[in-house]
Amino acid sequence: MRLHRLRDRSGVRVQDRLVWQAASLLLAYPDDGLTGRLDTVAELLGHVAGPAGELLGHTAAALRAREPMAAAMDYVATFDLRRRATMYLTYWTAGDTRNRGREMLAFATAYREAGVPPPIGEAPDYLPVVLEFAATVDPGAGRRLLSAHRVPLDVLRGALADAGSPYAPTVAAVCATLPVATDQEARRADRLAKIGPPAEAVGLQAFTLTVPPRRQEGAPSV
């Protein structure tokens, strides 16, 4: 049986886990460890079949072709300076409201229940962290977290695609591992992309996993 058809005991396809792991590495901040992460991604892609491998490969190739400083500046401009491109998943479901703390706690609780501590260097809802958890710790719980935040992922995918970002194919590969979005989810994603998340400014103490941390805030600049 081919690797992409195999499933682990949680029922998650091995190929999906490979996609999540590669995506986690590609979506991390391009620091001094980027070359090593790209080498790991190349090894993973040797086992990823079909369109997913091509999508991830596009991002990997684009990152290899860029100078480190240019890659870092593009990353900040893409994910920190564009509200629609935030990778903090609860930002789209709760915005800067009191509910966001509770929603981030749900991620931290999922990590603890799987036997690992919450993140140390990033917020628990940060997409590369969630992908790493889904790929390497608890695929079933990880898929549930990703599926529950399909709308934010679709908003992110659309924003990156509209901007012509090299990261867009990677988020598209992640979305392809999840159940197809319903009509209601598609409408909600479109609405959020136009008007933004709920608003209620309050102070939040962000949780602080192993992807390279970039900052302490849990929300992007607007």
PLM regions with names:
Residues 1-127, 131-222:
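Charged, alpha-helix-forming regions
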